[in-house]
Design a protein with these regions (language model features):
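Conserved non-catalytic scaffold segment of RNase H-like nuclease domains
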Residues: 1-81
Length: 81
């Protein structure tokens, strides 16, 4: 059975507060064994990273400022999953 393990990092915890995804990482498993198929990207959230999120992942506003926006990687991400 094929499965995808997905991990994200965000600017904060609440969508209600406008927080957004800054990193997506995925690996494909086949019968619980990792395949060589992976997807990874950093994203420009177009907003400030909260102090609490920065303490978790360490991605600064400066680091994320030149990354692609989600709309630019959405098709590739959806094709992977």
């Amino acid at each position: 059975m094929k499965e995808v393990v997905l991990d994200t990092e965000t600017t904060g915890l609440s969508v209600k507060d406008g927080h957004r995804i800054v990193e997506i990482g995925c690996i494909e498993l086949n019968n619980l064994i990792p395949t060589k198929n992976v997807f990874h990207c950093y994203l420009n959230p177009k907003r400030k990273v909260s102090e609490s999120a920065l303490k978790v992942h360490g991605y600064t506003d400066e680091f994320l400022s030149d990354k692609k926006e989600f709309a630019e990687v959405a098709d590739e991400f959806l094709a992977f999953i």
